[in-house]
Amino acid sequence: MKAYFIILTALFSSCVSNHYDRTESFTFSWKIGDFDQASQEIEKLAESGPKRDRMLYRMEEGAIKRLQNDFEGSIRAFSLAGDYYEKWFGVHLQSQTKISEELGSTIGSQEWKPYKSRVYERVMLRVYQALNYLQLGKEGQARAEIFKIRQAVSDAKDIWQKELDAARIMMREKSMDLDNGLENQMEGSLYEDLLQARSLVPSNLPDFVNPAAIYLEALFFLHGTNEKSDLEKARFSLRELYGIYPANPFIQEDYQQAIKNRSSKIPTTYIFFETGRAPVRREKRYDIPLVFFSATSRIPYAGIAFPHLVTNHNYLSSLEVFNGSEKSLTLPLADFDAIVANEFTKNFPIELTKAILGSVSKGALQYIATNAVRDESEEVRAVTGVGVGALAQGLTQSDWRSWTTLPKQIQFCKIPSPASRELTLRGVGTKLRESIILKPATINLIWIRSISAQTPLRVVNQFVLKP
């Protein structure tokens, strides 16, 4: 009995430290703009932190090194993150672990499982990696990363369908009806939080789509090469963007160029502006009502821990660009509140299945443990009851993990490049300013990062798309 209790205690103790605790120092350093300290913190986690989280740490590391203008270091970190993706999903989604097995592993906390990333994260990994290569003048490698953006979205649709099918099967095996629970009389705080997430998503945003990734792809094919097939790719991407932003004058102009099979010869600069911080996940406890269970189920309800999205509101609202004679204001392109919420609601049935199955499994564990000592003394039964209860509570945790250094929004504008080649950037409503000397070229691209309305503007990328 003593050994049994020690095992329970050890298991419970292992639940205490979570991802939020481990990354708190790193996140704080990044938020205040101390990128050197943040880089040291995340490198340490990437090398010696839990192996299950290494992919996430490498993505964070790659993002921080970009802010330090360490593009070679960023490439290495993102390449290692990409290796984890290949490990989890393999070529053409031939993963080593079946999705049904992954869903069926429900005893431990969701945070104990390897972090395999979310779709919007995999897309941004490829976007940042393409920008890294373009900064270093490696157009061939950048082209390969841009193709991987489309592949990530295509893979995501297949993965999502397989996971949803597996979730339905697993729930049926436990005498629970997933679709009935979601479609009929779902109510309470969990439903309210789901509706709140849905309210962040505009009706014209397609599933798993990041407009900033599409636009970078379009500009690369419109201005970066002279091949006819590339102009066709640019036209395809800009048509998709035009469907999302039909009133955006910059997209309209580029789309017309693609339709005419020629890019502008007027010296122009594109400015991309990352601002704020992406939504984070935080845990809430919910009771799941009877509606999720079939008439043959003997379980009246299940208590679960489930994530809800928390948006960040401290951000620079827009960037003004001045070329000496005219001004241009950045306009919305990719809203990560919407992108993250869209994927969150899309995956809601799958994540809910994991949470419910985990709760049921832990309930069974409690029953087995207490039943095993029913003939023992009252003291032993009490200690066992407390121990397994604490263990179940510790194991009932949602997955808080996500790529936290992503922005709240990516905005953009374009402006004629002046003869002086000097641009002045100003944070709207602030005293934040930055001056940039452009390279002599037909098409320049600038990538700016702002973490909050108080932190300085950071020039991350500056390169030539068309000489």
Model regions: which residues?
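Bacterial Sec signal peptide processing site at the extreme N-terminus
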Residues: C15-D34
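Residue at a conserved register position within TPR or TPR-like alpha-solenoid repeats
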Residues: S29, K65, Y133, F221-L222
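Glycine- and small hydrophobic-rich membrane-insertion segments that are intrinsically disordered
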Residues: V91-I107, M171-A197, F272, P279, ...
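C-terminal soluble interaction/assembly domains
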Residues: Y367-P467
